[in-house]
Structures are given as structure tokens and as C-alpha cells.
């Protein structure tokens, strides 16, 4: 069996293989995490924003994010206004799961 490698000069992402080999994750979750890791550090993460770069809808992206949260690859912290209402989420994305 032969292996084909692409010459990586520009526009590629270096990331850990950990999540790609994690048997607990669905292919959808692995793909979404890979996509999230390819985004710039200052990207404004949101469920709606993540749907812009893929074919999946909001519900599909939401279930993948919840799966990644369950396994420690994503943490979302609620951001509240002065009235205590949730106005946003801060995302922390990890290449390897955290407890």
C-alpha cells in the first residue's frame, strides 16, 4: 500500500493526532474539532459562527460541541450581562482532553 503526502508549503494546520484517534468521538466531533483548531486564535467562536464554515446546520454543530464538551475537548463558559442574562459563551478548545 502506498502513502500519498501533500507538499505543505502554505495554508495548513499542525495539530495533535490525539482527538483523531480517540475512539470515544464520532467522526462529526473529530471533524468539528479539527476545524476549530484550524481557526485563528482570535476567532469569535459561536454555534452560528461554526456553521458558516460547514454544510452542517446549527443542531448538528450543537450536538458535536456537546460531545466535545462531554469528553473534555471544549469548555464553554457563560457570559452574563448585569441582569444575569446569558449574552455569549467563551470557548476554550483543547487538542487533548482536560478533566
What do the PLM-derived regions correspond to, one by one?
Residues 1-10:
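N-terminal leader segment of winged-helix/HTH proteins
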Residues 9-23:
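Short, Lys/Arg-enriched N-terminal segment that forms or immediately precedes the first helix
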Residues 19-31, 36-91:
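Winged helix-turn-helix DNA-binding recognition segment
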Residues 93-99:
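Charged low-complexity intrinsically disordered patches
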